[in-house]
Amino acid sequence: MNEKNEVVGFDPAIGTEIAKRMGLKTEIIITTWDGITGGLLASKYDAVVGSMSITAERDEVIDFVGPYYNTKRAIFTKAGSDVTTVAQLADGKVGVTLGETHEQWARDQGYDINTYKGLPELLLELENGRVEAIVNDSIPVMLAMKAGQYDLAVVNDPTAEPIGAGIAIREGNPDLAAAMQKALDDMMADGTYLAIANEWVGGDIR
């Protein structure tokens, strides 16, 4: 949020630009991650531009436009933490967002986890020492660090692979999907996407 109480950032900027190119007015709705797909399916909003990883499981119930950027799983600790390797996560409390792919990954590793509704809570719990590490998509956390909000360290995870983040829409809307994809493709071709990425992320993340 900015000083005018407006929702700002990379995702809002991308969504707003796509809507503008489609001749639509943007209404940004903030919701918790654990209910974000349900809200889409209940028609509370028409698209989710919220760093949602494209997975086969999600693709069974929703459609995706994009990907509009690529990220990967990343593990963060407070700067100066004794936790510096993935192996050490087994000995501490790990924070994840409820319903994200990283929650299942952490459970599969057998970690002692706490689940939260979204990144703001994750970062706050890490800052307050209630978890030793958090697992999240790399880009959103890097954005928070770039804004100077948090002093964090990255734990090297050699098994992490790139993940495409897509714009989620309800199934059965081929015209909407095509129009959004065209707007996104045009943004990437004419330099608008890169300008937005440079402003909010500091580089090209396609």
Task: Kindly give the residue locations of the regions a language model identified.
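Short helix-initiation/N-cap motifs at beta->coil->alpha
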Residues: P12, E27-G38, S81, L98-E100, ...
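Extended ligand-binding regions for polar small-molecule ligands
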Residues: P12-R21, A87-Q88, K93, L98-T101, ...
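Alpha-to-beta junction loops
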Residues: G23-K25, L41-G50, K93, E127-P140, ...
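A ligand-binding cleft/hinge motif common to bilobed small-molecule-binding domains
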Residues: G35, M52-E60, L123, E132-E161
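Periplasmic-binding protein-like
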Residues: Y69-T77, S138, M142-D185, G203-R206
